[in-house]
Amino acid sequence: MYGIEYTTTLTFLILLVLLNYILKSITRIMDYILYTFLLFIVIVTPFVNSQNYGINLPITGSMDTNYQNVSNPEPFLTSTLCLYYPVEAETEIADSSWKDTLSQLFLTKGWPTGSVYLKSYTDIATFSINPQLYCDYNIVLMKYNANSELDMSELADLILNEWLCNPMDIALYYYQQSSESKQWISMGDSCTDKVCPLNTQTLRIGCLTTDTTTFEEVATAEKLVITDVVDGVNYKINVTTTTCTIRNCKKLGPRENVAVIQVGGSFILDITADPTTAPQTERMMRINWKKWWQVFYTVVDYVNQIIQTMSKRSRSLDSASFYYRI
């Protein structure tokens, strides 16, 4: 009887020692796995370019304030930049590899090769019909010309702002502008716009609705026309529809991914005087006219400062942007 009890006790002790050994072995294995994982994290962390949530987050002030977590000091590595310039720049530079040179110069400012696109245009009037603002950031170089000053001003107003536009059937309907932010935009190869104001009884004021030669002419053979008339008055409109389209538009606000640089001129064009421009700020600046290489050097040198005045857009813009809300 005592032999059976001794055997049972011995078996229990052996199982207890074996269980203790197994638990210690599992603990050592878990410690090894944990320390190996921590070592891997320590080694890999310097090479990971991820967001550090909670790092440098202020603990004072309003909790409603939005804070941006960015661990990458180069915000332009994933952005595209379009630089629009008059075709005469290529003629003056006369170097087949000048774009490659400019690309390398942009690289010194943090813009990778392939992220900057150089696009030429024939003249301001033609460019205004279809600007094609496709990049995240768009900078337009406009050489000052006293004869096209009004065209430059209208183009700047067009591309620096967003417009909500609808087609107009001027053959059937009268139209009026109910506020300062609502204007009519005409685009085409040749736009001649005429208007005939009407009173509350739809009777003409100083013109004959059946005779377009008596209409007041507000634009003659232009490619871009932004027409502003007296608010609250109906108008009969006449436009050369074969070469021009007209739309009823409302200025929504600034298009913040576009900037205009005026090249030359004694003063910079100012579109903020327009009461429809709100807020009263503009992304327009001037570079003294010298040579086109000097102009491009200046743009490259200050490109990042210029971009800081703009906001990146995640979608491309083209001519349809002026016709539909974006």
UniProtKB/Swiss-Prot annotation:
Binding-site positions, Ca(2+) 2: Q177, D228, V229, D231, D301
GO cellular component terms listed in the entry, alphabetical order: host cell endoplasmic reticulum lumen; T=13 icosahedral viral capsid; viral outer capsid
Disulfide bonds: C82-C135, C165-C249, C191-C244, C196-C207
A GO term for molecular function: metal ion binding
Pfam families assigned to the protein according to its UniProt record, in alphabetical order: VP7 (PF00434)
Post-translational modification remark: N-glycosylated.
Main location per the UniProt record: virion
Glycosylation sites noted in the Swiss-Prot or TrEMBL record: N69, N238
Subcellular locations according to the entry: Virion; Host endoplasmic reticulum lumen
Keyword Metal-binding: yes
Chain positions recorded as Ca(2+) 1 binding sites: D95, G206, T214, E216
UniProt keywords, alphabetically: Calcium, Capsid protein, Disulfide bond, Glycoprotein, Host endoplasmic reticulum, Host-virus interaction, Metal-binding, Outer capsid protein, Signal, T=13 icosahedral capsid protein, Virion
Chain intervals for the UniProt region annotation (CNP motif): 165-167
Keyword Nucleotidyltransferase: no
Family: Belongs to the rotavirus VP7 family.
Note: Some rotavirus strains are neuraminidase-sensitive and require sialic acid to attach to the cell surface. Some rotavirus strains are integrin-dependent. Some rotavirus strains depend on ganglioside for their entry into the host cell. Hsp70 also seems to be involved in the entry of some strains.
Function: Calcium-binding protein that interacts with rotavirus cell receptors once the initial attachment by VP4 has been achieved. Rotavirus attachment and entry into the host cell probably involves multiple sequential contacts between the outer capsid proteins VP4 and VP7, and the cell receptors. Following entry into the host cell, low intracellular or intravesicular Ca(2+) concentration probably causes the calcium-stabilized VP7 trimers to dissociate from the virion. This step is probably necessary for the membrane-disrupting entry step and the release of VP4, which is locked onto the virion by VP7.
Protein name: Outer capsid glycoprotein VP7
